[in-house]
């Protein structure tokens, strides 16, 4: 009851020390200035990367309305509120939609090549497909629609168990999906996913970051990577990468072999 949807706009879950931007210390009634919300340094970072690495693909990142709702209340409380206060949750999600779209549009206008929507907890480990349709899909669809109007591709990062909602994710209008965790970490079989939505979306990921990158030899990693490139590349394309986070203990050579294999696979025929 203490959260007024009119007073939320965008919360970065990884803000320094848990502080949110803009900082507020309770001296005056808080009213977010939605016309001048973002600090310039957020966008200077894009300029700096562009200036130092012109040959790299530079992507922006925003947090989905759903992610921000979870961070606002805490994961367990947020899931309870979905059941107890669904209308209040929808109002908050709608408010976060405005902020997420605004940030993504500003990143696009600053020159990023694509925008990633980080919606890590929208998989089966947290919510059912029906809840996804109610509390994730409408809001991400609107964010995607607005950013794509700037002529920039948009893709979504969702961890874990998403094999039961690939079509729902595609319905948001995104251009691609990131992570695609395979069993046992998740539930996405790459061949199955390509048959279902591979004509509409590019894929990024699907390499098991633990059982493959951490525990297998470079030769085995290369074999795994080649298979995924061959399966994933037809139709809408595939970006070779780990499914999700890379353990600090992953041997560097196992990461280097991904780059080498990708360049070898994509090299033009002589």
How would you name each of these model-derived features?
Residues 2-270:
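Active-site loop segments of alpha/beta catalytic cores
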